[in-house]
Design a protein with these regions (language model features):
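Von Willebrand factor type A / integrin I
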Residues: 64-68, 85-170
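Mobile active-site "lid"/loop adjacent to the S-adenosyl-L-methionine
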Residues: 24-28, 37-42, 131-133
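A generic short alpha-helical patch detector that favors 3-5-residue windows
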Residues: 31-35, 148
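Short, well-ordered alpha-helical scaffold segments within catalytic/effector domains
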Residues: 1, 55-59, 90, 153
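Von Willebrand factor
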Residues: 35-70, 82-84, 108-111
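An amphipathic, basic-hydrophobic helix/alpha-beta surface used to engage anionic
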Residues: 1-30, 71-76, 83-84, 91, ...
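Conserved beta-strand segments of the P-loop GTPase G domain that flank and frequently precede/overlap
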Residues: 74-77, 105-107
Length: 170
């Protein structure tokens, strides 16, 4: 909402793309107060129809739907990985960054960044319900987990900002 108000105050067009495992809603960029209020209302009322996350699908949609170069923001926890813990969106991110001025705002809980050494832990994906075991006693596993999202953003040459979910900014 803050980004939308800021863009509107600058007399820029504002649009929104809501996604889960698919693109759920696209509001094309426009100017005007009523359009801005529609985006805010949709943001407050949005309830995903599907579980999961597919960041690459959203980035491909952005790249195809918006033909002219634009400033765009991706707000996500970036927890969209394959079985080898590689981001599923790596290629789509590189393409979107090359086409648009894309900034990634990585929202996270600080407890997600530092995995404590407590041995085998069963974790559950909040979106899909899938469960798996993680060996937190492995230093390599902890280091890999702590560094992967930063490395992907750096490699894609995307401007990144990290927001802690426990902080209130407004």
């Amino acid at each position: 909402a803050v980004l939308a108000f800021s863009a509107s105050a600058n007399n820029d067009k504002v649009g929104a793309l809501f996604f889960s495992s698919k693109v759920e809603k696209f509001i094309p960029p426009k100017k005007g107060r009523s359009h801005l209020l529609r985006i805010i209302r949709e943001l407050l009322e949005f309830k995903p129809q599907t579980q999961g996350t597919d960041i690459s699908e959203a980035l491909r949609f952005l790249t195809n739907a918006i033909k002219r170069k634009c400033t765009a923001f991706l707000l996500s926890d970036l927890m969209d990985v394959d079985q080898q813990s590689r981001p599923n969106y790596e290629e789509a991110l590189k393409i979107a960054v090359n086409r648009h001025d894309l900034s990634v705002i990585n929202i996270y809980d600080p407890r997600e960044r530092e995995i404590p050494d407590v041995g085998l832990v069963r974790v559950r994906d909040a979106e899909t319900g899938e469960q798996l075991w993680v060996d937190t006693s492995s230093k390599a596993v902890r280091e890999h987990y702590n560094n992967w999202s930063t490395g992907v953003l750096r490699e894609a040459k995307s401007l990144a900002c990290h927001l802690l979910s426990e902080k209130i900014f407004i």
